[in-house]
Design a protein with these regions (language model features):
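NTP-dependent small-molecule kinase module
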Residues: 177-212
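Conserved nucleotide-sensing/catalytic segment adjacent to the nucleotide-binding pocket
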Residues: 51-109
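The conserved Walker
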Residues: 20
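Short beta-strand-centered segment that lines the nucleotide-binding/catalytic pocket of NTP-utilizing
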Residues: 37-53
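Hydrophobic positions on the alpha1 helix immediately C-terminal to the Walker A/P-loop
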Residues: 27
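A glycine- and Lys/Arg-enriched "phosphate-lid" helix/loop adjacent to the NTP-binding pocket
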Residues: 130-175
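Hydrophobic anchor at the beta1->P-loop junction of P-loop NTPases
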Residues: 16
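Conserved glycine(s) of the Walker
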Residues: 23
Length: 212
C-alpha cells in the first residue's frame, strides 16, 4: 500500500474466506504486493493447531487423519464433509481469533485467507484494528469441476479416482452456498471471482472499500 494511504489508515486486517478453488491464495498474494501487507493462510494456522491439538477438543479436525481418499469418501457423505469443513472453521477459530486480535508482529496489518474464515464467527472479534472481510465464490459448477479435476481437494488430483472428485464438487458447492448465505446475513461482501486479475483485483478492492 502506498505511504499516503497507510498514513491515514488504522492497522488493517483483510480476511478472505470462501470455498476451496476460488483463488483465495492467489488473490491474497496479489493484494499483498499491491497493498504492501504480509499475508498468511488458515491452512498454516490449522497445521499448527493440528500439531498440538487434543483429539477430544478437536474431534472434527483430527478424526480423518490417515484415511485414503476412498476410505474418506466411503465414510462421509458430501453433506457430512461440508459440515466437517464448517466445523474445522469453528474448531480453529480460537487460534485465528487470537492472531487477529493480539498479533502485532505486523504493525500495519496483514491479510489472512482460507476456508476456515466463517462469516458467523467474525462478530465475536474484539479489536481496534480495521478488519475488512470478504468472501469469494466462482462462476459456477463448470469452473469448480475444472479446478477440482485438475488439482484435487483431498490430495493431488492424480492420486485418487475421478469418480471421487464428483463428491468433492457436491460438498464444495454445499459449503459455498452456506458461506454465501451467511455472508449476506451478516452484511459482508461476496465477490464472484473470474480468475482474471485485471477484473478481480479492482472488484475486490472496491468491495473492501479501498482505492482501485
Amino acid at each position: 500500500m502506498s505511504n499516503d494511504i497507510m498514513g491515514v489508515m488504522a492497522r488493517m486486517i483483510i480476511l478472505i474466506g470462501g470455498m476451496p478453488t476460488t483463488g483465495k491464495t492467489t488473490l491474497a498474494r496479489e493484494l499483498s504486493q499491491k497493498l504492501a501487507l504480509p499475508w498468511l493462510s488458515t491452512d498454516q494456522t490449522r497445521l499448527v493447531i493440528q500439531g498440538v491439538a487434543d483429539p477430544k477438543q478437536y474431534p472434527q479436525l483430527l478424526s480423518a487423519h490417515g484415511l485414503s481418499a476412498a476410505e474418506f469418501f466411503q465414510r462421509f457423505s458430501p453433506e457430512e464433509i461440508a459440515e466437517r469443513e464448517y466445523m474445522h472453521g469453528i474448531e480453529t477459530w480460537p487460534g485465528n481469533k487470537k492472531l487477529i486480535e493480539d498479533d502485532f508482529t505486523w504493525r500495519e496489518g496483514f491479510i489472512l485467507e482460507g476456508v476456515n474464515i466463517l462469516p458467523s464467527l467474525l462478530p465475536s472479534l474484539q479489536t481496534s484494528s480495521d478488519v475488512r472481510p470478504l468472501f469469494l465464490t466462482d462462476e459456477g459448477d463448470d469452473v469448480l469441476r475444472k479446478a477440482i479435476f485438475s488439482r484435487g481437494l483431498y490430495a493431488d488430483a492424480d492420486t485418487y479416482a475421478d469418480e471421487l472428485k464428483e463428491y468433492e464438487i457436491t460438498w464444495a458447492r454445499l459449503f459455498d452456498q452456506r458461506i454465501q448465505a451467511e455472508a449476506q446475513q451478516y452484511g459482508y461482501p461476496v465477490v464472484r471471482i473470474q480468475k482474471d486479475s485485471e477484473i478481480d483485483i479492482p472488484n475486490v478492492l472496491s468491495s473492501l472499500g479501498l482505492p482501485v
